[in-house]
Amino acid sequence: MTQMEDAKKGVITDEMLYIANREGISPDKLRKLVAKGYTVIFRNKVHDWVKPVAVGSGVRVKVNANIGTSRDIINVEEEIEKAKVAVKYGADTIMDLSTGGDLDEIRRKIMKAVDVPIGTVPIYQAAEEMLAKGKAIIEMTEDDMWRAIEKHFKDGVDFATVHVGVTKEVVEKMKRIKRVVGMVSRGGTFLAAWILHWNQENPLYKDYDYLLELAKEYDVVLSLGDGLRPGGLPDAGDELQIAELYTLGRLVKRARKAGVQTMVEGPGHVPIDQIPAQIKLMKVATDNAPVYVLGPLVTDIFPGYDHIAGAIGGAIAALNGADFLCYVTPAEHLGLPNVEHVREGVIAAKLAAHAVNLLRFEDEYRKDYEMSLARGNLNWARQFEIAFDKDKFIEIRKERPTKTEACSMCGDLCAIKIIQEMLTKKQTS
């Protein structure tokens, strides 16, 4: 039985109880949301040590951190450190997007290193195995694709991106609809190229029922990938993106009938004024499936600062219904991120998520209230306790010290200090 099947039968699972307690909501409310497919629970049946996480309606906006090797840089220990740092700074989930080295070993080591849910893109492994054999990616067979997917599910991944919306029909449209950036999804591109080469339908779409069987066996959440997401602002909201979205919406409904949990991935580059409409359209087209967005980035001309562009877009997306933010690092569009890039990316995404969560959950807002109270009292010890990034708090305080009880920005000119002293003097006089 999957979490969705249990929920439909009125069963509150251990995972639902655990999550409801952490989220501060009633177990039965969570059960109803899971039954409808409005909320998903990450917890592969064989991933025994994972702490389950819920994404979707009625729960907090979550943050994912992507890590993984590339064909140029293969350092397994660094990837494990990235995973640990990401979790330390609040990542709710990790995606291993490795494309270089022993992918099975890397994935399994990352899964053992942390206790948060793990996601992958299995088609990457199918493609990498072709290259390792000296073959072209388009030479992979349908069996190669299915073997990679089943291997990841058996290993215990809790969610997996599958580009089921890259169909033969939409690939044909690509021949007449010109984009500025083109197609930027790796997994989506692998499948589009395969379709063009063999003139056959995407196996993951053609045999979607088989994909559902595999996902159901392990209770893996299918993250329906946006292979045709816009890779730059000029391509946002074009016919290709929207055509894929409506295909994904139909596939969500089929998955729900089969008792399989799904979420839908969203755009990566969107002008700031279009974000509310795009997220709301996603919710309508998918019957309120959980929405997973990469950013979205609100500008393209700040390489090195894309984590900030992504946090701005992520906050707006979450405010308008996005449920799951995939972080963006300062290395986006430039190279493979290092550990520090991962830390900065997670913090930026957590900031965006918290900005929305504090509007919906009293305990989240309480943190900000307590910080305001501590600042109003110049209580630095309390501010440190509440601060999200305590290391940065200490670093700046030590770098620019002051002899006053204020900070080195104002010192004796501190507005809070002056008015407190004057009010106290007035009351005692």
Curated annotation (Swiss-Prot):
The protein's Enzyme Commission number: 4.1.99.17
UniProt: [4Fe-4S] cluster binding residues: C407, C410, C414
A GO molecular function held by the record: 4 iron, 4 sulfur cluster binding
Record's keyword terms, sorted: 4Fe-4S, Iron, Iron-sulfur, Lyase, Metal-binding, S-adenosyl-L-methionine, Thiamine biosynthesis, Zinc
Cofactor(s) required for function per UniProt: [4Fe-4S] cluster
Amino-acid positions noted as binding Zn(2+) in the UniProt annotation, renumbered to this chain: H269, H333
S-adenosyl-L-methionine listed as a keyword: yes
CC cofactor note: Binds 1 [4Fe-4S] cluster per subunit. The cluster is coordinated with 3 cysteines and an exchangeable S-adenosyl-L-methionine.
Recorded catalytic activity of this chain's protein: 5-amino-1-(5-phospho-beta-D-ribosyl)imidazole + S-adenosyl-L-methionine = 4-amino-2-methyl-5-(phosphooxymethyl)pyrimidine + CO + 5'-deoxyadenosine + formate + L-methionine + 3 H(+)
Function of the protein: Catalyzes the synthesis of the hydroxymethylpyrimidine phosphate (HMP-P) moiety of thiamine from aminoimidazole ribotide (AIR) in a radical S-adenosyl-L-methionine (SAM)-dependent reaction.
Protein name (record): Phosphomethylpyrimidine synthase
Organism lineage: Archaea, Methanobacteriati, Methanobacteriota, Thermococci, Thermococcales
